[in-house]
Amino acid sequence: MDNSSMNSFLEYTICNRGTNAYSPKAGYQHLDQALSGPFHTGHARYSHNADGRLYIGGSNQPAAAQHQHQSGVYAHHQHQTHQSGIGLTYGGTGTTSYGTQACANPDYAQHQYFINPEQDGMYYHSSGFSNSNLGPHYGSMAGAYCGAQGAVPAAPYQHHGCEGQDHQRGYSQGTYADLSRSQGRERDTDQSPPGKTFDWMKVKRNPPKTAKVADYGLGPQNTIRTNFTTKQLTELEKEFHFSKYLTRARRVEIAATLELNETQVKIWFQNRRMKQKKREKEGLAPASSTLSKDLEDHSDHSTSTSPGASPSPDS
């Protein structure tokens, strides 16, 4: 192996150590800070061996210059308010991946990607940290994940930190406000008094139907057929022959005599006049003028032949 490439190798031990999933060896803590800054110009090589160690090295820069450059980057990191983090995970299948993100606020976000060996999906995890909680190295990060093979959860999981925290906070506040408004409306609706009942609402516009349903289907609405007796029909026919139009006084008198109401007598006379006109058009009945003259002649003859009109024997 080339000596120039061996001078700048970084060794990261990946094992099941709980929260210390991303911890360099002692003496290489300042080199870890250099990863967040600009890298040296050269081709870096990544390799891992069978015991689960990942090696990162460069081959185009001397060891002393590279060490000085990394120390400068570490000193520059002390004055920065936020840095982008690199999360490295290693699984038993030999597949490695890492993700970085620069935060716009002082909070620090760490992103990790885990490949599920059983499914083709990818497990994404992002957690937020504050700069005040970070030390000179990332050994105590609580968001790192390092487990045995097959320990990666099967279901996809996604959690956003950093810039998404403000958005999630605003979204939760907006949702709470909407729920409060909707609950307030429901409360007002429940507490509202019942509607006032006006007098015109109490009036029954449609009187109850007293007619029975016909044997063969329903009849017209609000139509009550009056069944007249033979005596009632005879008296009404006699009255119709004398006068086709009744005065109100005569109508009331006939209704009281026949045990009917005024409306029933009025409607019967209307129907009888329509029936008479229909018969006259068809020629089945004599004209009304001829009938009236015959009735007048008959009345005059009966009056002249009455016993009261005959001369007395004393005269």
Swiss-Prot record:
This is Homeobox protein Hox-B1. GO terms for molecular function: DNA-binding transcription factor activity, RNA polymerase II-specific; RNA polymerase II cis-regulatory region sequence-specific DNA binding. Its main location: nucleus. Residues 221-280 bind DNA. Residues 302-315 have a biased composition (Low complexity). It comes from Cyprinus carpio. Belongs to the Antp homeobox family. Labial subfamily. Pfam families: Homeodomain (PF00046). The keyword DNA-binding applies. InterPro entries: HD, HD_metazoa, Homeobox_CS, Homeodomain-like_sf, HXA1/B1/D1. Residues 177-200, 272-315 are annotated as: Disordered. It comes from the Eukaryota. Sequence-specific transcription factor which is part of a developmental regulatory system that provides cells with specific positional identities on the anterior-posterior axis. Acts on the anterior body structures. PANTHER family: HOMEOBOX PROTEIN HOX-B1, HOMEOBOX PROTEIN ROUGH-RELATED. PROSITE patterns: HOMEOBOX_1, HOMEOBOX_2. Keywords: Developmental protein, DNA-binding, Homeobox, Nucleus, Transcription, Transcription regulation. It is found in: Nucleus. GO terms for cellular component: nucleus. A motif (Antp-type hexapeptide) lies at residues 197-202.
